Amino acid sequence: MKYFKRLSDRERAIFEAGITLGAIYHQFCGTPVSPGTAEEVAKCIERAALLQPCVIDARVEVDVSSEDTDNYGGYTEVSGRNLRVTIVTRCGEWEAVGKLEFIEELNYPLMWVEEIRRVEQ
C-alpha cells in the first residue's frame, strides 16, 4: 500500500499494535461496566480490535470487583486501572505483541511493545 511504502513490515506491525492499543484505551475508557458485564465488555473490545488492520489476536481483561460497584448506580467504568490488553499484529513475516496494563510503580496505564518476532509465512 502506497501509504506504508516507507515502512518495513516490522515497523508496520509495531505501528499497528500501537495504534490499536491507543484506540482501545481512548475509545472504551468510560464505558459502564459491572462484575456481571465485565466479560461481555472485554469480548466486545476484543472483537472491535480484531477489525483493525493486521491484528490477528486480541486478549482483553476488565477487572471489576463488587467493591468497585458499591455505589448508587451499581457499576463503574472501564479505566486504565482495570483494563489489561494484549494485541498481536502481523505484517508480512513480522509479528508484534503490544500490551496495555496499569503499572502500580508508575501509577500509570502503560502501553509497550513486549515482543517483535519474525514468523514463517
Curated annotation (Swiss-Prot):
Provide the alphabetized UniProt keywords.
Lyase
Return the Pfam families for the record: DHNA
Q: Where does substrate bind?
A: E16, M111
GO annotations under biological process?
A: tetrahydromethanopterin biosynthetic process
Reactions catalysed, semicolon-separated, are: 7,8-dihydroneopterin = 6-hydroxymethyl-7,8-dihydropterin + glycolaldehyde
EC numbers listed for it are 4.1.2.25
Look up the domain of life of the source.
Archaea
An example Gene Ontology molecular-function term: dihydroneopterin aldolase activity
Pathway named in the protein's UniProt entry: Cofactor biosynthesis; 5,6,7,8-tetrahydromethanopterin biosynthesis
**Family matches, as InterPro entries:** DHN_aldolase_MptD, MptD_sf, MtpD_C
Q: What does this protein do?
A: Catalyzes the conversion of 7,8-dihydroneopterin (H2Neo) to 6-hydroxymethyl-7,8-dihydropterin (6-HMD).
Instruction: Summarize subunit and interaction data from the UniProt record for this chain.
Output: Homotetramer.
| Similarity annotation | Belongs to the archaeal dihydroneopterin aldolase family.
For this entry, the protein name equals Dihydroneopterin aldolase
Organism listed in the record: Methanopyrus kandleri (strain AV19 / DSM 6324 / JCM 9639 / NBRC 100938)
